[in-house]
Swiss-Prot record:
The record marks E338 as: Transition state stabilizer. Keywords: Lyase, Magnesium, Metal-binding. InterPro entries: Enolase-like_C_sf, Enolase-like_N, Enolase_C-like, L-Rhamnon_dehydrat, Mandel_Rmase/mucon_lact_enz_CS, Mandelate_racemase_C, Mandelate_racemase_N_dom, RHMD-like. It comes from Burkholderia ambifaria (strain MC40-6). The record marks D291 as: Increases basicity of active site His. This is L-rhamnonate dehydratase. Pfam families: MR_MLE_C, MR_MLE_N.
Length: 392
């Protein structure tokens, strides 16, 4: 039977949660006093939204095939991403066979190279790529993980990212990743508060529970090295994304100087096989964390993961809900997954992209069997108001 072709490509935006998970109401833990690259400025220290972390909003990409099948995906990109999809990328998709994913990715990437490479352009390409995989799964009546070669384990195990690792332990997670609250601009007092927070959590969770620090690009090499060595006393498992993404030399230096047994992780804001090649060949980290909605999508993550495997480096994708679950379950070098605690107080398990997706699975007792519904197995919530700002 002949495969259908792509008939229509549409791009929408939506506000309030969803893929832009920083777009939350007041009082959410993710917008608390958390160290960022902007923490050097006191006026932008108390809230991440104060410097515009949520300005982009969510991008929804919808791709319709000639047989009526519709695939979709969500990522961070908002109106900028919608413009790129409608006015530039759609030409490389419409009329093509739904199986031509590699060619479509290649053309999207090289056509945007002069203004893209990373950032919102790669977010957008990632969203299109994920929608293509969702569409192919629906056309073939298979979950994406089967298209990727099938599962290598029966279930996923998760660590939790959020403000309350002590509650995450009670919920069955294998570890908890804390947002670092104070950066170098807050001097010795900030460093002391960071360590006191870690010590308090270690006291609450005991010795057999992973604790990690998410530093969100906020540190310099000197501070990160001090923090890592001081945190070793409290059994910190890894220190994450300490430095700006382009400081490969700094990451290599940091990794040489952290305590023995502590891992350095990064990659959330890296993109494509070429960016991750730098991290891997320069010995920057022990664990990479590509976001499948930002790094280039599933098509590129396959290549990134293979590179990492050849360097004996684990791949634990950043957040991204079902888009990472379907990948992680198929890879031996992805032994566990991340779950972002999106409840405002990090005190209950709610779907990461709530309220945008329906049927979005969540861990139970820190574990999950990935659903076998076609594609990524989720639906758009019809109660969320989608806006199509551009057409083509």
């Amino acid at each position: 039977m002949a495969m259908p072709t792509i008939k229509h490509v549409r791009a929408f935006t939506v506000r309030g949660g969803g893929a832009d998970y920083h777009d939350q109401d007041d009082g959410h833990w993710i917008d608390d006093h958390i160290a960022t690259p902007m923490s050097r400025y006191p006026e932008y220290r108390e809230s991440r939204r104060s410097f515009g972390i949520n300005v982009l909003g969510t991008l929804v990409v919808e791709i319709e095939a000639s047989d009526g099948s519709v695939g979709f995906a969500v990522t961070t990109g908002g109106e900028i991403g919608a413009f790129i999809v409608e006015r530039h990328l759609a030409r490389f998709l419409e009329g093509r066979c739904v199986t031509d994913i590699e060619t479509m990715w290649d053309q999207m990437y090289y056509a945007t190279l002069y203004y893209g490479r990373k950032g919102v352009v790669l977010n957008t390409i990632s969203g299109v790529d994920l929608a293509l995989w969702d569409l192919l799964g629906k056309v073939r009546g298979e979950p994406v993980y089967q298209l990727l070669g099938g599962p290598v384990r029966d279930e996923l195990v998760f660590y939790a990212t959020g403000a309350r690792p002590d509650l995450a332990k009670q919920m069955g997670f294998i570890g908890g990743k804390l947002p670092l609250q104070h950066g170098p601009a807050e001097n010795e007092e900030g460093l002391r508060k960071n360590l006191e927070k870690l010590a308090d959590m270690r006291n609450r969770v005991g010795d057999d529970f992973w604790l990690m620090f998410d530093c969100w690009m906020s540190l310099d090499v000197r501070y990160a090295t001090r923090l890592a060595n001081a945190a070793h006393e409290y059994g910190l498992k890894w220190i994450e994304e300490c430095l700006p993404p382009d400081d490969y030399w700094g990451y290599a230096d940091l990794r040489r100087n952290v305590p023995r047994g502590m891992m350095v992780s990064t990659g959330e804001h890296e993109a494509t096989r070429w960016g991750f090649r730098m991290l891997l060949e320069m010995g920057c980290c022990d664990l990479i964390q590509p976001d499948v909605g930002w790094c280039g999508g599933i098509t590129e993550l396959i290549k990134i993961s293979a590179l990492a495997d050849a360097h004996n480096v684990m791949v634990v994708p950043h957040g991204s809900s079902v888009y990472s679950y379907h990948f992680v379950v198929t890879r031996h070098n992805s032994p566990f997954a991340e779950f972002l605690m999106m409840a405002p107080k990090a005190d209950e398990v709610v779907p990461m992209f709530t309220p945008l997706l329906l049927d979005e699975p969540v861990p139970v007792n820190g574990r999950m069997k990935v659903p076998d519904r076609p594609g990524f197995g989720v639906r758009l919530n019809p109660e969320c108001a989608l806006v199509r700002p551009y057409t083509h």
